[in-house]
Amino acid sequence: TSARVKELLLLEQNSGLYSKETYDKFKERVRESKFKLLELLRSIKREGKRIIAIGAPAKGSTLLNYCSIGPDMIDYVAERSTFKIGRYTPGTHIPIVDEARIFEDQPDYGLLLSWNIADIIIPKLKEKGFNGKFIIPVPTAHVV
């Protein structure tokens, strides 16, 4: 192997990537994140509030499935892509509808499934007239 490959392998080793403990800690952080999200969503539902999801990326489906979040918790997923509208989220079977619906319905909360671009999505939806609050699911679920 080249010197660069050896350097990268050493960096990985020094970063703990070959240690079971690293992955055990990661697993616990992921579990904790899941429980905090579910706790937040359940408390919102107990208040009688409506929650929808915003965006239908693949990572959003992973989150919904891992947390067992379905149509009992999320009314629908608002999406811009015409390819996805009229379909359902894989595994959790939440209907995917045109994003325009959120401006008519004005649900209380929108769970951002494209949380990595929240800083782009939130201002655009507010500018278009969405009055609800936003739930950022990870790394720690919180409302903005």
Protein language model regions, located:
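Flexible loop/turn segments at secondary-structure boundaries
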Residues: 60-62, 84-85, 119-120, 143-144
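A short, well-structured juxtamembrane/interface segment
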Residues: 29-47
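Phosphate-bearing ligand-interacting subdomains
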Residues: 92-144
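Glycine-rich adenosine-cofactor-binding loop
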Residues: 44-65
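Substrate-recognition/cap helix-loop segment adjacent to the acidic, metal-dependent catalytic center
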Residues: 62-75
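NAD(P)-binding Rossmann-fold cofactor-contacting core
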Residues: 74-88
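Flexible, glycine-/basic-rich loop-and-beta segments that form/coincide
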Residues: 1-29
